[in-house]
Design a protein with these regions (language model features):
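Short loop or secondary-structure boundary microenvironments that flank
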Residues: 31, 77, 105, 242-243
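Amphipathic helical "hinge" segments at domain boundaries
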Residues: 54-122, 126-133, 226
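Residues at secondary-structure transition points
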Residues: 7-11, 36, 40, 58, ...
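Short beta-strand segments enriched in small/hydrophobic residues
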Residues: 19, 26-29, 63-79, 85, ...
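N-terminal helix-turn-helix DNA-binding module of bacterial transcription factors
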Residues: 1-69
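Bacterial carbohydrate/catabolite-sensing allosteric modules
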Residues: 1-6, 51, 89-102, 108, ...
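Short glycine-rich anion-binding loops that position phosphate/pyrophosphate groups of nucleotides
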Residues: 136-138
Length: 261
């Protein structure tokens, strides 16, 4: 296919249509993955798109499909590796599916319902298609469940805390329950492996350093540890830490060692 077009001029959908020998509506259907296009026509349009270097306007696609192809993500715990790693993985998978991520961060311990709702309102102004909420703490989990949004939402959290997952789901309207999913790391399975390893080595006593109680992962791990350790008759002493700072755990350990010696 040979084209004549002014250099540096962004190609239009009409140029793609002319080159492919189809209507601009057909080009739009191909761009928006409509099933109402034959394979041969789709291939011809795609060849024209590739030759011209055409890139569809996101705003035009959103207008035509009534979808922004954007996911709004709210997360707490900006300074912690686990949550940053989760955001990176989610963004990578979204990009593979032709979706965009719009990310906003909140303080995981100080976030209020009003803060959370304001962020959701901002995302709604962007016409996001769905929400992902990374809720490491009880206050964020409760806010995510109470959020007044009608789009599909995925809440990433842990099973245990001041509010159970079942209690959280009860805060969501019946209509929105069908559009809500909750996922998280299998903290119980991980702790079962830890306790099993201690049993294999024949240990009968252990110190358990528990993370901040307002963090749902820490709460879940502690519940799992207590039940699983008791089942194996492991005598455990719980050392509570108020932060995830390694220096705090180190100071607790030194204090215990000094007391023993």
């Amino acid at each position: 296919m040979v084209t004549s077009r002014k250099p540096n001029k962004r190609p239009s959908m009409f140029e793609v249509a002319k080159l492919a020998g189809v209507s601009h509506q057909t080009v739009s259907r191909v761009i928006n993955d409509s099933p109402d296009v034959s394979d041969a026509t789709r291939a011809r349009v795609q060849a024209a798109i590739d030759e011209l270097g055409y890139r569809p306007s996101n705003s035009a696609r959103a207008l035509a499909s009534r979808r922004s192809r954007t996911i709004g993500l709210i997360a707490g715990g900006l300074k912690f590796f686990g949550l940053i790693s989760a955001i990176t993985s989610i963004e990578s998978i979204a990009r593979e599916h032709g979706l965009f991520m719009s990310v906003m961060m909140v303080h995981e311990a100080l976030c209020t319902q009003s803060d959370f709702d304001n962020l959701c309102d901002t995302f709604n102004e962007q016409n996001v298609d769905a929400f992902i909420f990374l809720t490491p703490t009880d206050v964020m989990f409760a806010a995510a469940c109470r959020a007044r949004v009608n789009q599909p939402r995925v809440i990433v959290t842990s099973t245990h805390g001041q509010m159970t997952v079942r209690e959280g789901m009860s805060l969501i309207s019946t209509a929105n329950k069908r559009r809500t999913a909750m996922v998280g790391i299998d903290q119980w399975g991980a702790m079962a492996k830890v306790v099993s390893l201690l049993g294999e080595y024949g240990h009968k006593s252990a110190l358990y350093f528990a993370g901040p109680n307002e963090w749902r992962d820490a709460h879940t791990r502690l519940d799992a540890w207590r039940k699983l350790a008791a089942a194996r008759s492991i005598d455990s002493q719980i050392v509570r830490c108020h932060t995830w700072d390694a220096d705090e755990a180190y100071a607790h350990m030194n204090h215990l060692l000094d007391a023993v010696s």
